[in-house]
Amino acid sequence: MMKRELKKIRLKYELDDTIVIPQVDSKNIRLPGLEEFVIERGKALRVYRGMANRLADSGWVKIGEENLTLKDITSMRWLESSEEVLIKLPEFFYLKAVKLIGEGKDSKIMEVQNDLQEIIDIRLRKLIKLVFLKEAPANILERLQPEEKLLYSFLKEALKIWQKELMSPDGG
């Protein structure tokens, strides 16, 4: 179940709109599931992120959104470790961080991976504390990434069932 739900989050990320800036003069492009359209150099347009990545790989466009950098990840690690509560991370943070690792230079990949793992560990400890609250504050839950919301719901439900089973005279 968890794996399937994580795949849905990845799909949502790929189907999210993003802005691209064409780097070529007029070209007719036909993308799967869409009508043919014309791209013109410098004229921004919105496409699905998955398509934007393919167009960028071909050199036809540059993606308009800013990618995460090593500096971003390092500062988020520092902030996360210095705050008692979860910090607000950029939307789809984990998927963007993994993309950075995939595109990274060998010398920096290990540093990004270590910082990302530390962010995950710190946030997981904070998330587990939330699971034990009767009701977590809405403003804190809003700071969870989609993958973390999934884990929070799963753990909360598992704990609820476990407690119910323990307290039931017939085991459920």
Where are these regions (language model features)?
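N-terminal, Lys/Arg-enriched amphipathic/low-complexity engagement segments
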Residues: M1-N28
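Compact, well-ordered interaction domains used in eukaryotic information-processing assemblies
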Residues: S26-T69
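Short, functional N-terminal and low-complexity linear motifs
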Residues: V20-Q23, K62-E66, E80-V85
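Generic alpha-helical propensity signal that fires on short helical segments
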Residues: Y13, E36-E40, D57, I63-E65, ...
